[in-house]
Amino acid sequence: KLSKGAFDFVGCTEAYFGNLLPEAPVFRLAEYTYAELRKNGGWDYMANLMGIKGVHMVARHHDFGPFHLWLSKKIDKPNLKGLHLRVAPVYTAFFKSLGATVQTAALPQIYTLMENNTVQGYGWPALGWVPPWAKVTKYRVEPGFYTSTLFTMANQKKWNSLPQDVKDVINKAAMASEAKGEPAGPEFKASLKKQHAWLEKQGVGVIEFKGAERDFWVKSAKDAAWGEVLARSPVHGPKLMKLFTK
């Protein structure tokens, strides 16, 4: 709708414009800060692809941090066989690659599905968590994977029509938000620390994979997601992988 002019500006996660651009998931897979992506050409590459679709990328204005698997039952290794999980497209391939069965469901249904054991877990970012879920969630699996990024975007024609001084104001505010929302930054780390402390008080424990199991978990997440990107975009995918990963 943004690309067709129904809206002038939109703020949303990249998961919402994957239907417009199959390469969109690379944003959640970035292993560089956004300042680094702006320097190495990664941001410009994606901005050009979005521009072709009629959308101007302004900035990444917020980040809810890494996604996690949240569970009602304990697991002792990175093997999800025997678990039925609520999923979104973001991490469906990853969870299925480790043996889970999956189903989609609207956000308001997650509590009930966990409560009645229809599902034993779900994926969700580190921040932006729904407090009542603590009653039906027992564990957060570490490490997290991907990042939950939100972007400010404009209809390309509308953006082109704006006076330069207006563009400058928008860009200045957007870039300040982009820097502030960096997961490696102090403000995000402080928010995450506060969130983890609250979860601990609610009785939500941590399952942390270490050593080879940690490496396997992280690699499985990366391989599953990039596998989808490369399959959907054989031309741009390999180039973007070089720009977005270390």
Give each language-model segment a name.
Residues 41-45:
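Core domains of carbohydrate- and sulfate-ester-processing enzymes
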Residues 1-36, 48-246:
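N-terminal secretory/targeting leader peptides
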